[in-house]
């Protein structure tokens, strides 16, 4: 992988997370889930062409932006680990999410989860979370880890590298019927 392509991936990842955060209105302590197929980023087929370099470039683009705002990064593993989440122990404890025992590797968990495991201060795996927003890079199906109600968010870019991206924020359920008043549009 060329340095130019790594820089492109990093810049696109940073731009995507910044645009989504602008629309999602997350606050300090919220959780942001990222599912990332490094295979799709480099133009391969999901699960077949894992790239630590691509995953590291995504991490370099996303992690500092979230850390600056005090937002927790949750990294979704691949389907071989049942799409478990890698996150900081402190975040899991804050939300009461139960730890499971596994250490991701590029071909069992994915390069993205492996990269995050190596970068986090005190990484743990959890089976399921309810994130406040997230980015799906390359068709990784993050919906199972989003709070209800998920709201699609369109960004100015539609790809990171060669991978399609889909983004979502969440909002509380609107209840009460026609006489109710809501604070959100």
Task: Mark where each language-model region is.
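Short glycine-rich phosphate-binding loop at a beta-alpha junction
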Residues: 30-35, 73-74
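Ligand-binding beta-strand-loop-alpha-helix segment within the catalytic cores
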Residues: 69-131, 138
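N-terminal glycine-/serine-/threonine-rich phosphate-binding loop
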Residues: 1-32, 52-65
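Solvent-exposed alpha-helices and their adjacent loops that cap or buttress functional pockets
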Residues: 24-26, 108, 154-159
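Active-site histidine-anchored catalytic micro-motif
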Residues: 41-46, 50-57, 64-83, 108
